[in-house]
Amino acid sequence: AVRLTNEYIGSLPSRKGKKEEYIIRNYDVGTDTISHVFTVAMPGDKGMVNLMLENNAKFSDKEQLALNIWGQMLRNRLFAIVREQESATYGVNVEANSITFPYRKATMMIGFETQRDKVERMKEMIYKELDRSQHELFTQEELTPILVSIKLSRSQAEENIGIDYWMNVLNTYAEYGEDVTDHSDKLLEGMTVEDVRDVVWKFLKKVKVRDWVIKSEEADPLSDWEK
């Protein structure tokens, strides 16, 4: 990245221009927990659950990777519980993410659709698994397939590296001074279940919870001709 920057970007003619000023606006709400149930008119017996956990702490590159891995392991656990054991939904969406610009934030999003009367029980199970993630280690059997999958995805991506990839590398180096091609494989090789548990503990220690539920209105048992 350094060589490419010096040889190509650095060799482009430049001119003194106007320094752009901008304001970063963060619309986050300071309240730790926001929970609400919306009842709306829509067909079917539906209860849509959307949980978002947010933490504004600083996470290292290794911790960000561990956070992503935790999201994948949690997805597998919740799928086994909510779908396979409880038959309460077709699937569970779990996504962990972190950003450093325009402001720092790590998030964990969990969403699924079930029946109205199963919403609270399924939510209890999810919160129980979040707490379990914080206090108990995942097993190596849960971690290994995810590490293999990430390595395979990266290997396949490297076979199709194009200009977009290198532009992203150069942009990251220019903005943050980081060479993202250097260390990701090393972080992956050294990842342990203890690393995952540690980042879960850090993330959940001071987390904001956004708990939204959308339920369909209960159907009127009387048909139109009976009213």
Regions found by a protein language model. Give the residues of each.
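C-terminal, active-site-flanking charged/polar segments
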Residues: 10-14, 75, 130-132
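In a subset of proteins, long, contiguous C-terminal domains/tails are tracked
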Residues: 189-227
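Glycine-centered hinge/linker elements that transmit conformational signals in sensory
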Residues: 4-18
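Generic recognition of flexible, low-complexity loop/linker segments
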Residues: 37-39, 80, 95-98, 184-186, ...
